[in-house]
Amino acid sequence: SPAPPACDPRLLNKLLRDDHVLHGRL
């Protein structure tokens, strides 16, 4: 499946949130 546009603020927010959660679990 094609990746959604990188300019999508909701996508960026989700990626940032997921990244933050992953780092918090380390």
Swiss-Prot record:
Q: Name one GO biological process term.
A: thrombopoietin-mediated signaling pathway
Q: InterPro entries given for it? A: 4_helix_cytokine-like_core
GO CC list: extracellular region; extracellular space
Localization, per the record, is:
Secreted
- Recall the GO molecular function terms of this protein's record: cytokine activity; hormone activity
Family, similarity comment? Belongs to the EPO/TPO family.
Q: What does this protein do?
A: Lineage-specific cytokine affecting the proliferation and maturation of megakaryocytes from their committed progenitor cells. It acts at a late stage of megakaryocyte development. It may be the major physiological regulator of circulating platelets.
Note what the entry says on domains.
Two-domain structure with an erythropoietin-like N-terminal and a Ser/Pro/Thr-rich C-terminal.
Protein known as: Thrombopoietin
Q: Which organism is it from?
A: Sus scrofa (Pig)
